[in-house]
Amino acid sequence: APALQDERRYAAGMLGQILGDSEGSRFYWSLVETGIAEEAQAQYDGRDGVGDFIVYASCGPEDAERVEDLLRQESARLADSLQEDDLVRVRSKVATAAALQGELPGGRMRRIGQRWTNLGAYRSLEEELAAIDAVTLQDLRDTAAAFPFEWTVTGTLDPQPE
């Protein structure tokens, strides 16, 4: 995934939300709403010089293989399934979260500190919202193509045998 210094971080964050937000995402509808998993999420984690997409789910051991298959299927088809209404919904979610975080002193200071530490520059909330609003459907598709959800590490936590 793109690094924090890469402007594609906005699209990457939105892709993570579309794929695996706790409500209304691809994972939510295919895994949580259907009762196959208790929880299934994906997120973008941008860092200094590197970024990752993190995917996880919680389910019973008897459903683990099926859940992993569905996670992989949804991840693989994300880029081809993106629609304009996905962009409208996620843009609204991300902008609202940024605005709410900006209203709290701790959230505002955390954002300022992270931006300064990682980017060496200050960006106002208005500039941040403009960058979110500037993301297009093609940006989402291009970012998904440049940074596909390829699984490099997979781990499981199983119940202890009795």
Set out the residue ranges of the language-model regions.
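Double-stranded RNA-binding/processing signature
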Residues: 9
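Non-catalytic beta-strand/loop surface segments
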Residues: 1-5, 17-65, 107, 129-151, ...
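Short acidic alpha-helix initiation/capping motifs at coil-to-helix transition points
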Residues: 6, 66-69, 118-123
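C-terminal regions of mature proteins
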Residues: 77, 90-162
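M16/insulysin-pitrilysin zinc metalloprotease superfamily fold
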Residues: 21-22, 41-101
